[in-house]
Amino acid sequence: PLDLGTDAFYATRRDAIEARLRQIGEEGAGERILREHDRRFRGVLARGVAWERFSEEALAEGVVRLGGKRLVAVLGPLARDYRSWRRGLPDLLLWRSEGGFGGVGCGGEYWAAGGYEVPGADVWFAEVKSPRDRVGPHQKAWIATLRRAGLWVEVCRVVGEDCVGAEGRADGGEG
């Protein structure tokens, strides 16, 4: 909608938005709603939606792992005030799966691997930072909101040696 990101968006749709959030909060409803909307709208141009980043299966897995109440903790702020909450959501959503963990990243990656686990958490968010990067105000707001909802959130500092990409080494040296 053209008014997404304005005060009018939520004000004119308050009852419908709150009803949908209550519906999503019911156990199992999130996956059903996601699959229905994915089939109906996948590929339709919409502000803030990058269909090519995530498959229906990756989205459904994330929705199931989060569960209704925690999903509402993520969607509620976006629906009520998109302008303020569109930035800062942590980079990764991770969850326990057989043999380790699975997850989705902001670039659309979907994986399952063994190794890293967060004690006592079945699903968690990770904000990834380089050594010189700092957690900004929008990220701090999201971290606090997600933690209040009972979600585990970690800030992960990554340090790499011999980081090689398409342009060569990150330090400017020869790859």
Features from the language model and the residues they span:
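Conserved catalytic cores of phosphodiester-cleaving nucleases, focusing on short active-site segments
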Residues: 57-74, 78, 91-94, 102, ...
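Intrinsic disorder/low-complexity segments
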Residues: 106-109, 169
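Nuclease catalytic cores
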Residues: 1-87, 135
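Long, compositionally biased low-complexity repeat segments characteristic
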Residues: 97-107
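Basic, glycine-rich
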Residues: 158-175
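An N-terminal amphipathic alpha-helical segment
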Residues: 84-96
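Basic, amphipathic alpha-helical patches used to engage nucleic acids or provide basic targeting signals
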Residues: 110, 118-158
